[in-house]
């Protein structure tokens, strides 16, 4: 039960949310959460009481894994979740307030907010996906984040930590926790973990097929043996478990997300086979991966926010589609330093015609030129799609370019 003050705070938040909607200023979840938090600073703790909560965090894949975990846990009962990805305090308050009676919760949480959010909601499970630099002007943060996560987990020894053992930094964050479920969820991007986060010495990597395929040359720190892993068709788990897993979402990275989602749900009592069936039904995440008709084109929309995310998203692109559009902005939420474009291997598209789009499409066009990729430049993303031959078009956009495209599509109806 929440206090009288909390009930008043939630009522005020609901009023603010309603006002935001009727005045056309947005869905109102954030402002509703902010108002409630302003009136009662303990509101998040009160809303989290009495629930079994999963906290999901990492640089990439948070929204997708949250959506999959919520689907898997939905087989056990009602689930409160921040499905639209508002992953800081106000968004979490709004999500929990909207589902007051749900005894289960799955919360996507920004990496730096995990410790104090965990202190408030006392999670039963914490899912650690991956850590890499999000923006070049924030490159130093990943080691700080790892240490912050490690310290935060130490305050919750009873939580089950579902950690990606292919990611050096997340493995370090979870390494000292007493209840860890290790998942081999993949770690194709290794540029941000060349040194051991514990000793500063080098990390040696072997082929993934070999045992201990990464280890530190300094501290006694190496890749743990996974409890869960996957291949193209099957998810493997404890005690010889092997379940067919054919996802609606593309890419190896999403099979890794699904493996961690299933492991988290099983930790809370879900039946593994039922959980796998549920995650396989997820076909869209807040507009990502969806296919929309735009005139004579069927456009599939992918989101990429940082070098690691771009590498994964570009790997999902069907190079044999009728058109490929890559849209890049350079606003503050994207990171204004776009030199990361030179870290992404666009050379894979040397036999594919690409349309460079977005406010920083010219920067992208220069990079594509050096990569030997045939390209044209059309700054408006919708116009870029229209410039492609009729048929299927693959669209990859960074954060604000993705939002602009979503708004443009909404206006078109």
Predicted regions and their residues:
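ATP-dependent carboxylate-amine ligase
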Residues: 1-33, 266-271, 277-413
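Phosphate-binding loop of NTP-binding sites
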Residues: 4-182, 189, 195
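Adenine nucleotide phosphate-binding catalytic loops in nucleotide-utilizing enzymes
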Residues: 5, 181-308
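A short, flexible N-terminal coil/short beta segment enriched in small residues
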Residues: 42-71, 246-248, 264-266, 276, ...
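Buried hydrophobic packing segments
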Residues: 69, 73, 92-96, 258-268, ...
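Short glycine-/acidic-enriched loop or helix-start segments at secondary-structure transitions
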Residues: 91, 116-117, 137-138, 171-174, ...
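Short, surface-exposed amphipathic charged segments that create phosphate/polyanion-binding patches used
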Residues: 96, 142-143, 192-203, 386-394
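Residue-level signal for inorganic ion chemistry
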Residues: 108, 129, 162, 257, ...
């Amino acid at each position: 039960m929440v206090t009288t003050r909390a009930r008043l705070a939630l009522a005020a938040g609901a009023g603010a949310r309603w006002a935001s909607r009727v005045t056309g200023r947005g869905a109102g979840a954030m402002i509703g959460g902010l108002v409630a938090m302003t009136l009662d600073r303990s509101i998040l703790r009160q809303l989290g009481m009495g629930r079994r909560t999963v906290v999901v965090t990492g640089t990439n894949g948070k929204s997708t894994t949250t959506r999959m975990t919520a689907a898997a846990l939905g087989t056990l009962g009602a689930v409160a979740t921040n499905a639209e990805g508002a992953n800081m305090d106000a968004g979490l308050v709004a999500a929990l307030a909207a589902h007051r009676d749900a005894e289960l919760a799955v919360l996507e949480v920004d990496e730096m907010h995990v410790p104090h959010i965990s202190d408030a909601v006392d999670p039963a499970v914490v899912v650690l996906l991956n850590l890499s630099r999000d923006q070049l002007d924030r490159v130093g943060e990943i080691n700080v984040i790892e240490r912050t996560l490690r310290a935060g987990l130490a305050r919750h020894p009873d939580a089950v930590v579902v950690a990606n053992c292919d990611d050096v930094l997340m493995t370090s964050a979870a390494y000292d926790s007493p209840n860890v479920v290790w998942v081999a969820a993949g770690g194709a991007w290794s540029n941000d973990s060349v040194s051991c986060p514990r000793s500063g010495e080098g990390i040696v990597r072997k082929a993934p097929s070999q045992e201990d395929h990464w280890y530190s040359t300094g501290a006694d720190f190496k890749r743990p043996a996974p409890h869960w892993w996957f291949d193209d068709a099957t998810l493997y788990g404890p005690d010889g478990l092997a379940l067919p897993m054919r996802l609606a979402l593309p890419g190896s990275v999403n099979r890794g997300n699904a493996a961690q989602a299933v492991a988290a749900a099983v930790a809370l009592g879900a039946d593994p086979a039922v959980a796998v069936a549920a995650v396989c039904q997820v076909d869209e995440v807040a507009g990502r991966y969806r296919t929309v008709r735009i005139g004579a084109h069927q456009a599939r929309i992918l989101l990429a926010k940082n070098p690691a995310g771009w590498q994964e998203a570009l790997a999902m692109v069907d190079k044999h589609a009728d058109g490929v559009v890559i849209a890049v902005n350079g606003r503050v939420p994207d990171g204004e330093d776009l030199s990361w474009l030179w870290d992404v291997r666009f050379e894979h598209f040397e036999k594919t015609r690409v349309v460079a789009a977005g406010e920083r499409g010219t920067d992208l066009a220069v990079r594509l030129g050096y990569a030997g990729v045939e390209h044209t430049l059309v700054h408006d993303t919708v116009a870029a799609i229209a410039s492609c031959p009729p048929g299927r078009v693959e669209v990859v956009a960074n954060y604000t370019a993705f939002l602009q495209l979503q708004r443009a599509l909404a206006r078109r109806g």
